[in-house]
Structures are given as structure tokens and as C-alpha cells.
């Protein structure tokens, strides 16, 4: 455990609570001290949900520490069962309350005797797993619980559906554009003539889980969430799963062709090639845009990418393969699955970076000085500090990246949204230059703001005047190179002569 003021993936209990609050009529009891109970505020503030967050904190206070937690936790579970009538109550500790080493399995068994609904302990090691791993394991645990329960009662659905059908696994509350992706995936499946059997966990009932065995295949659009569940369903029912993320023109087509292969192997006779061609040429604007003069202006520009495995890998491929942009490095904070990420992106970028340290990522960005950054909320902050534009492509994110308008990243409409995001993230040089020539609302001070708040060098009046003559879209880079040149040679202030010398020395 380490103290950090920024984490890319939160602690394990956040993952468990995301899964529990994604299902309909499921309540979570969090056994935790005050301070660990920020999930309710975070969810209601960020994801703009209409419903109250179904999470209750069973507070660990001094009375609990003196007498033990069992009585309080059991009372809270039974009370919520009577008040809310949930189908399932999930009990989760946090990494703080796990220190108490209490027998929470026993608490659940005691509560189950009095509760009318089901009660379950989210069995996750809070010191070994992060938010994403815990979410994946909790979803798998809930699915297994209800399938085994249905099997014991003889309620498990037999056989497959008459027409091709799919379980879409992994869309959750607080996910990056998950609601929009979910709508786009349902639309895509309808276009392909495939019925959505279940969509879990977002908006699903735990009572729907017993019919998951009827699907022809499982689709896992997000690498981080749903793979464990899909593997369990394959093991139990022989249901094949597809884990190709349909993001970008090429990967969406590859996903559709894999679906065709999987359902044809089970007796269907479909050919989706005409559909792929129609969508690629006429519905998605991305393929046309990639051949336009606008996109050619981006060819060879430098970019860096950082995020979770799913989004960082997909955006890296789109930038390099579909838009001709030079990805200097691509990175992920999913250290536990680094091998997969390397395999996916190594041929599309110069360097692969695996790190959970935002400081290291910020330094790597400053080192290569890209034309644009594609990352999380933290990379947006880094970009503002360095005066480099940033497109947000992965969680963790702030409220502006939970858009009310329709902005999927998946499917063919997703390709349009991603293309817009990428193109608009690059600073258009003439725009900056014209503002300088003709003025506007921007003041000279705003346009020439420093790239670093803690610069130890002074610019003289003639040095600053000379710097201001340089077009805005390259001024930041010239300033950084000049300051580096001055530090290396021990100058305390930068005048016009130093600027000229730096330009000659480093080609700034």
C-alpha cells in the first residue's frame, strides 16, 4: 500500500460497488470507516444517474472496535432487506476495515437467516486487487451464484435460443462512455440480426442471469471487465466468447467477421461482408476522412496514448493504422495485464510504457513533446501545464466526460466520434497564428502563458519580445528548448542573444 493523491484505478471496494450499483434492485453494504464512503458522492456527481446510489455504509467507529462488528453489520443488512426489498445484498469491506480480520462469511450466514433476499460477501483480496480486477471478480461471483442457484432449483434455461443471440458482458456505472457504447452495441447487434439475450451488469436484474446459458455467444467489449465471467460460461455451457473490442473501422470489421464465424459454426448461414462494406464506405465517415486533405495534415504528427488496456490499445491502433499519426509511446496503468497490452500495441508505437505513477507519465510526455496527448483526466492536467492539447479517451475522468449527448466510442458511430476527438485534439497552427495577427478576446499574456509554473529562469524584455514574434503553435516548444539550452550552459536569464544561440544549437 502506498500513499497517493492520484490513482488511475481505485481501491478494490470501488470495483465491487460499481458492479452492485449497476444491477437493478441490488443493494450494497460497505463495512468501512468514515472516509471510505465517497462512492455515493462520486457516482451521483459524475455519472448523472437519476436514481439514488444503492449503497449503505455500515460505519466502523470506536464502538464497533470495542464490541466487534457482527451485530451492527447484521442489523444493517436485515434493516435494508426490510426497507428496500432488494433481490440481493452484497457486503463488502474496504482495505481499511479488512485490517480487522473479521469473519465476514459468518456475518453473511447470520444475516441470511433473517433476510428474505439473497445475501453475499464480495470475496476479493483488498490488498492484491485494484478497482478493475475487483469489479471483474465480483461480476463473476454474482453470475456463478445465480447460475448455481438456478441449477439446484432446476430453473436453469435449457438449450439455445431459436435465433442467434448474445450476452453483452461488462458495461457498468462510472464506465467511460459505457451507456453510449451499450446503445451502439445493441444497435449493431440488431443490424446483424442478433438478439441481445442479456446485457450485464448495467440495468440488468440478477433474475436474468439464469438465462445466460441460452446465448449463442458472449461479447466482452472491455478487456478489464467480463473476461472471467465469459470464461466461466464457456467452461460451464460451451458458449464461445469474443473479446475483440469493436472500436475503429478495422477492429469493428474484425469483430463482426468473428461473430459471423462463431454463429455460422453453430448452424447459422450469414454473410456480413456487404454490411461491413456499406457501413465502412457510407455510414462511418472515418474511412473517407482518413483519405481527406484534413487528415493528411496530421500525417507524421507525434502523439502519445495512455489509459486502460481497452481504450489505450484501440486508440493507438486507430492513430497509427487508420490516420497515419506517429505514436511515440503508448502506455497503460493495467500492470496486471501488461503482457496483452504489449502484444497489441508494440508494432504501432516506438515505445510501450507500463506504469501507475502519474509523475512518470507526466515526465514521459514532457520528454517527447508530442503534438497531442490521448489519455485520462490526469493527462489532461499535464497537457494544460505543458500547453499540449489532450483528448480524453479513458477513465478516470471528470464530469465533462460523462456527456449527455450521444457519444459512443464503439461501432460505426463510434468511429465518427473518435475521428472528431482525434482531429480536434491537434492544435491547428493557423488558428493560433491568426489570433495573434488579428487579436480577439485572448490577451497576449494568455497566449504566451508559461509552460511550467516553476520556471527558474527570467526572460528579459528583448528576449520575451523576440519569443512573441514566433508563431503561437510552435512557441511553447521553442521556449522549452531555449530554457533547456540556458540551463545546460548556466545562464540565469534569457535575452534575445540566448534565444538566437539556442535556435542555432538545437534547431528550435
UniProtKB/Swiss-Prot annotation:
Ligand binding ([4Fe-4S] cluster): 36
Source species, domain of life: Bacteria
GO biological process: one example: light-independent chlorophyll biosynthetic process
The EC number(s) this enzyme carries: 1.3.7.7
Gene3D superfamilies attached to this UniProt entry: 1.20.89.20, Nitrogenase molybdenum iron protein domain (3.40.50.1980), Proto-chlorophyllide reductase 57 kD subunit B (1.10.8.550)
Active site annotation, chain numbering: 294 (proton donor)
Residues annotated to bind substrate: 429-430
Keyword entries, A-Z: 4Fe-4S, ATP-binding, Chlorophyll biosynthesis, Iron, Iron-sulfur, Metal-binding, Nucleotide-binding, Oxidoreductase, Photosynthesis
Record-linked SUPFAM superfamilies: Helical backbone' metal receptor
Pfam families on file: Oxidored_nitro (PF00148), PCP_red (PF08369)
Pathway: Porphyrin-containing compound metabolism; chlorophyll biosynthesis (light-independent)
EC top class, as a word: oxidoreductase
Catalytic reaction annotation: chlorophyllide a + oxidized 2[4Fe-4S]-[ferredoxin] + 2 ADP + 2 phosphate = protochlorophyllide a + reduced 2[4Fe-4S]-[ferredoxin] + 2 ATP + 2 H2O
Function per UniProt: Component of the dark-operative protochlorophyllide reductase (DPOR) that uses Mg-ATP and reduced ferredoxin to reduce ring D of protochlorophyllide (Pchlide) to form chlorophyllide a (Chlide). This reaction is light-independent. The NB-protein (ChlN-ChlB) is the catalytic component of the complex.
Subunit structure: Protochlorophyllide reductase is composed of three subunits; ChlL, ChlN and ChlB. Forms a heterotetramer of two ChlB and two ChlN subunits.
Protein's recorded name: Light-independent protochlorophyllide reductase subunit B
Lineage of origin: Bacteria, Bacillati, Cyanobacteriota, Cyanophyceae, Nostocales
Amino acid at each position: 500500500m502506498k500513499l497517493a493523491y492520484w490513482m488511475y484505478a481505485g481501491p478494490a471496494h470501488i470495483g465491487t460497488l460499481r458492479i452492485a450499483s449497476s444491477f437493478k434492485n441490488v443493494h450494497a453494504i460497505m463495512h468501512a470507516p468514515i472516509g471510505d464512503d465517497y462512492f455515493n458522492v462520486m457516482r451521483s456527481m459524475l455519472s448523472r444517474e437519476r436514481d439514488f446510489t444503492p449503497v449503505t455504509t455500515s460505519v466502523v467507529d470506536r464502538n464497533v472496535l470495542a464490541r466487534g462488528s457482527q451485530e451492527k453489520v447484521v442489523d444493517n443488512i436485515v434493516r435494508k432487506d426490510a426497507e428496500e426489498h432488494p433481490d440481493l445484498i452484497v457486503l463488502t469491506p474496504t482495505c481499511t476495515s479488512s485490517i480487522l480480520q473479521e469473519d465476514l462469511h459468518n456475518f453473511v450466514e447470520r444475516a441470511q437467516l433473517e433476510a428474505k433476499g439473497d445475501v453475499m460477501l464480495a470475496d476479493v483480496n483488498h490488498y492484491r486487487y485494484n478497482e478493475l480486477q475487483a469489479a471483474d471478480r465480483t461480476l463473476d461471483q454474482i453470475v456463478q451464484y445465480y447460475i448455481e442457484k438456478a441449477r439446484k432449483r432446476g430453473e436453469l434455461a435449457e438449450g439455445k435460443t431459436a435465433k442467434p443471440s448474445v450476452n453483452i458482458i461488462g458495461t457498468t456505472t462510472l464506465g467511460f462512455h459505457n451507456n453510449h457504447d451499450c446503445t451502439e452495441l445493441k444497435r449493431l447487434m440488431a443490424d446483424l440480426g442478433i438478439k441481445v439475450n442479456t446485457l450485464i451488469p448495467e440495468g440488468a436484474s440478477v433474475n436474468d442471469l439464469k438465462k445466460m446459458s441460452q446465448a449463442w455467444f458472449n461479447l466482452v467489449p472491455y478487456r478489464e471487465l467480463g473476461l472471467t465471467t465469459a470464461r466461466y460460461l464457456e467452461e460451464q455451457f460451451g458458449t464461445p466468447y469474443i473479446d475483440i473490442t469493436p472500436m475503429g473501422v478495422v477492429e469493428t470489421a474484425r469483430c463482426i467477421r468473428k461473430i459471423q464465424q462463431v454463429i455460422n459454426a453453430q448452424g447459422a448461414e450469414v454473410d456480413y461482408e456487404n454490411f461491413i462494406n456499406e457501413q465502412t464506405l457510407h455510414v462511418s465517415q472515418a474511412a473517407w476522412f482518413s483519405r481527406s486533405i484534413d487528415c493528411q495534415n496530421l500525417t507524421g504528427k507525434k502523439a502519445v496514448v495512455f489509459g486502460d488496456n481497452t481504450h489505450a490499445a484501440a486508440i493507438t491502433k486507430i492513430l497509427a493504422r487508420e490516420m497515419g499519426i506517429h505514436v511515440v509511446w503508448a502506455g497503460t496503468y493495467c500492470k496486471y495485464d501488461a503482457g496483452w497490452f504489449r502484444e497489441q500495441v508494440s508494432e504501432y508505437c516506438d515505445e510501450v510504457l507500463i506504469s501507475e505513477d502519474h509523475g512518470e507519465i507526466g515526465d514521459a510526455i514532457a520528454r517527447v513533446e508530442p503534438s497531442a496527448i490521448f489519455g485520462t483526466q490526469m493527462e489532461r492536467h499535464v497537457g494544460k501545464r505543458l500547453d499540449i492539447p489532450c483528448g480524453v479517451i479513458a477513465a478516470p475522468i471528470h464530469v465533462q466526460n460523462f456527456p449527455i449527448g450521444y457519444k459512443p466510442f464503439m461501432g460505426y458511430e463510434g468511429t465518427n466520434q473518435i475521428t472528431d476527438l482525434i482531429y480536434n485534439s491537434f492544435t491547428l497552427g493557423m488558428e493560433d497564428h491568426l489570433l495573434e495577427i488579428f487579436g480577439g478576446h485572448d490577451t497576449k499574456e494568455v497566449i504566451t502563458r508559461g509552460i511550467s509554473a516553476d520556471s527558474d529562469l527570467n526572460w528579459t524584455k528583448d528576449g520575451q519580445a523576440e519569443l512573441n514574434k514566433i508563431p503561437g503553435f510552435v512557441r511553447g516548444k521553442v521556449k522549452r528548448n531555449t530554457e533547456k539550452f540556458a540551463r545546460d550552459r548556466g545562464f540565469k536569464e534569457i535575452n534575445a542573444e540566448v534565444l538566437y544561440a539556442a535556435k542555432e544549437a538545437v534547431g528550435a
